[in-house]
């Protein structure tokens, strides 16, 4: 969503992004009541993409609740609203701690509605940046991704460190890193184009750095 807003000044780096091809696990709508009955949604202020996606998906369900921006705390949000959107570690924590709440996984719902992967994050650079520096950074990212994909010991160490930093169980993070895709293909890019057009109102094609 931020890319769509600043598209004239940015281009996308190819091959890498943050995508899901079904469940994403870390972008969730939580509700005290059935989704078809919700009238208010608490929104965090830290993810424009997830907010745009949620509004699009609820619109596809013919729902038009009141949206209220507030701090990303589940208890506070559900005191004031029927439902709330959480992302990242907060979503993973809440899913584990409150299994009885109604949950909507936005990656899975996007897949159900469109049949496409959902790209939650992109790697972008300013159009006036040095192309050599961009290519160098892009190569470093791809090298790290390749190591994570192919080196089991490195992967386990990354998951272990991530578990300590996030307080998420290693087993859950192992699952999470399977739900989130970083090496994207043409189908992921097709999903990105659809999201930018349908949820963000971006009519032009996204521009790649090369």
Residue ranges and their predicted role:
Residues 70-159:
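Pocket-lining segment of extracytoplasmic ligand-binding domains
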Residues 1-31:
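Glycine/small-residue-rich interface belts in oligomeric ring/scaffold proteins
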Residues 25-82, 87-89, 190:
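Bilobed "Venus flytrap"/periplasmic-binding protein-like clamshell domains
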Residues 9-17, 65, 99-105:
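Active-site regions of enzymes building and remodeling cell-envelope glycoconjugates
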Residues 5-9, 52-53, 95-96:
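Short glycine-/acidic-enriched loop or helix-start segments at secondary-structure transitions
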Residues 202-210:
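Conserved C-terminal helix/tail region of periplasmic/extracytoplasmic solute-binding proteins
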Residues 18-21, 32-34, 43-50, 115, ...:
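Short coil/turn segments
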Residues 129-198:
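Secondary-structure end/capping motifs
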